[in-house]
C-alpha cells in the first residue's frame, strides 16, 4: 500500500485503546510516527464520542494536516482504525482511496 502512494511514510492498524496492532513504515518522516498516532488516538476517541453525542452519524474518516505532514484516519469498526501518514505534498487522494479500498482486508486481518 505504501509503495503505491507518493510521499507515504507509514500505515498503521490501531486499536481505540491507542495500541498499534500492526505498522509498516518507509522513508524518514522526521518525527516519531507511532507516537503521533498514539497521541492522536485519544483525540480520535473524543471526536467519535462527540459525533455520537450530537447524532451526526457514524464517523468514517478524519484528515489531520500539519505544516509537515498529513494523517488520514479511517474507521474500520468499533475496535480499530487505520492511520495513513504522508508528507504534506504527498498524494492525499490516493492515500484516502487505498485506505477505503483496503478497509475490509485490514479488519479481516485482526478478526
Feature-to-residue mapping (PLM):
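Non-catalytic interaction/Regulatory regions outside core domains
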Residues: 1-111
